[in-house]
UniProtKB/Swiss-Prot annotation:
It comes from the Bacteria. Binds the 23S rRNA. InterPro entries: Ribosomal_bL28/bL31-like_sf, Ribosomal_bL31, Ribosomal_bL31_sf. This is Large ribosomal subunit protein bL31. The keyword RNA-binding applies. GO terms for molecular function: rRNA binding; structural constituent of ribosome. GO terms for biological process: translation. Gene3D superfamilies: Ribosomal protein L31. Keywords: Ribonucleoprotein, Ribosomal protein, RNA-binding, rRNA-binding. NCBIfam families: L31, PRK00019.1. Belongs to the bacterial ribosomal protein bL31 family. Type A subfamily. GO terms for cellular component: ribonucleoprotein complex; ribosome. The lineage of its organism: Bacteria, Bacillati, Mycoplasmatota, Mycoplasmoidales, Metamycoplasmataceae.
Amino acid sequence: MKKDLHPQYYSVAVKCETCKNEFTLKSTKKEFKIDVCSKCHPVYTGNRSQAKSTGMIEKFNRRLAKKDQQK
């Protein structure tokens, strides 16, 4: 095998910015910061973000009311 051909692997602490969860991975990068991890992502937890869904409902109701006023 050739020397200095393969990248160096590091043990990296990955930090979730949302829930502050930390876990360790092996990578060629020295640092990771992620927005959402499996501990706080809605797909994995089964929880929906109420604020986001409420905002979408309000937006739909405003468009519907605007359409009714035009008639």
